[in-house]
Amino acid sequence: YDNFDDGKIDKKYEFKNHPGKWVEKGGVISQTEPKPGDHTYLVMAGDFDEPHTSIVQIRVDEWGDGDLARCGLGFRLDPADASGYAFLIHHFLTNMEFLNDHLAWKQNDTKPPFGVIKTGEWYWMKAEISDKKFTGKIWPDGEKEPKKWLLESKLDFGGLRPASGQVGLNGGSSAALPAKTVVSFDNWAICEKASECDPDVILAVEATSKLSTTWGKIKTSY
């Protein structure tokens, strides 16, 4: 778990395949280069057993429509170049989709249930991976988490990637305008079960700066 409150990027994080320009300031971490290159991940190389779930608060700060405009969560990231499965805001701020990096899109373009992702506003993104399927959802900060996953799929697009235990924050892929992505993240956690990745629990942890046994295990497992 990381609430990014100390203003220092954890030395355990890795930046692949392109480094981007990550800045931790004001209690958030941001990828501030609008054209960081395809692809740009902050990676937590944690050897997390599957299934596992990742949750994060996300805020799109700048956006230009285009195929390489994207941001979100990555799983089974390759230790060499961080290619993996991703749950992304993609192309437009009205579209969510699954990607197998550089191999194939799932082609499951889906509009968020609330319509459009607005720049400058916070949302929660949550996704889970197992050997059977990949799932993801997004909802506005301050609203109740939807019970159902927005996207669900078998790992059947672009060829099967091996489990790596590595997860990451996708900070964009654009190499040229008009596509661009500047994005911020906060309150990032990886959990053994989807039910443990609960915003109320995470925000309570942030408020008290005290980790329960479960969170302590997560914190020390990478």
Predicted regions and their residues:
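Secretory/extracellular carbohydrate-interaction modules
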Residues: T32-N100
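Short carbohydrate-recognition loop motifs
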Residues: G20-D38
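Short, aromatic/His-centered strand-loop micro-motif at the edge of beta-sheets
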Residues: D101-W124
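Short tryptophan-centered beta-strand motifs in secreted/extracellular beta-sheet-rich domains
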Residues: F4, S54-V56, K118-S130, F134-I138
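Flexible glycan-contacting loops in extracellular carbohydrate-active proteins
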Residues: K147-V183
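Beta-strand-rich interaction surfaces with strong enrichment in secreted/lumenal proteins
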Residues: T40-D47, T110-I117, F157
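Extracellular carbohydrate-recognition regions
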Residues: Y1-N17, P199-L203, A207-G216
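Extracellular beta-strand elements of beta-rich domains used
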Residues: F4, D186-I190
